[in-house]
């Protein structure tokens, strides 16, 4: 599935779901006395970056943390690698809804804060317009949309899980 703004001329385009960016970490990162009670507390942990440090700067600014020093923590080139590092307890990363849903639902990751950034780009289901009404295409598209909607329902029930 392509990731982008939904502009693919000549194709039938359906948004899989809206996309937000938010911090996630492994519950094992917060064992013992380690706490995350305010967004600024994240700076006491390794921040796992993807491509550059801009997403963390944007997220922290939106959460009311200005002028944070972001030169610590690894910079990885794939979101999946950053999520794997967070799962391993190596730090806190910023994750997208669709890429972290399963790990959040199953308790392998947690969201320490409800703050999130809405992203303009997301994942899309696309197919040539000539094939959009084929039964196998309709069945597959409807299944994908139902799975995404189910994940979002479970995530809403889950909410933010803090370790105190």
Where are these regions (language model features)?
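Residues that form or immediately flank small-molecule/cofactor binding pockets and catalytic motifs
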Residues: 4-5, 52, 81, 114-117, ...
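C-terminal effector-binding regulatory domain of bacterial HTH transcription factors
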Residues: 97-106, 116-164
């Amino acid at each position: 599935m392509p990731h982008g703004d939904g502009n693919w001329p000549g194709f039938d385009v359906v948004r899989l779901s809206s996309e937000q960016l938010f911090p996630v970490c492994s519950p094992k990162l917060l064992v013992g006395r380690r706490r995350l009670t305010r967004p600024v507390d994240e700076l006491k942990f390794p921040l796992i970056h993807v491509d550059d440090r801009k997403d963390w700067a944007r997220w922290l600014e939106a959460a009311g943390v200005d002028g944070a020093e972001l030169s610590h923590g690894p910079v990885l080139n794939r979101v999946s690698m950053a999520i794997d590092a967070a799962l391993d307890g190596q730090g806190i990363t910023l994750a997208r809804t669709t890429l972290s849903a399963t790990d959040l639902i199953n308790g392998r990751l947690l969201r320490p804060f409800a703050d999130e950034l809405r992203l303009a780009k997301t994942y899309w289901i696309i197919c040539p317009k000539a094939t959009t009404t084929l039964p196998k295409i309709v069945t597959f598209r409807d299944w994908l949309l139902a799975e995404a909607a189910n994940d979002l329902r479970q995530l809403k029930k889950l909410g933010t899980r803090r370790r105190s």
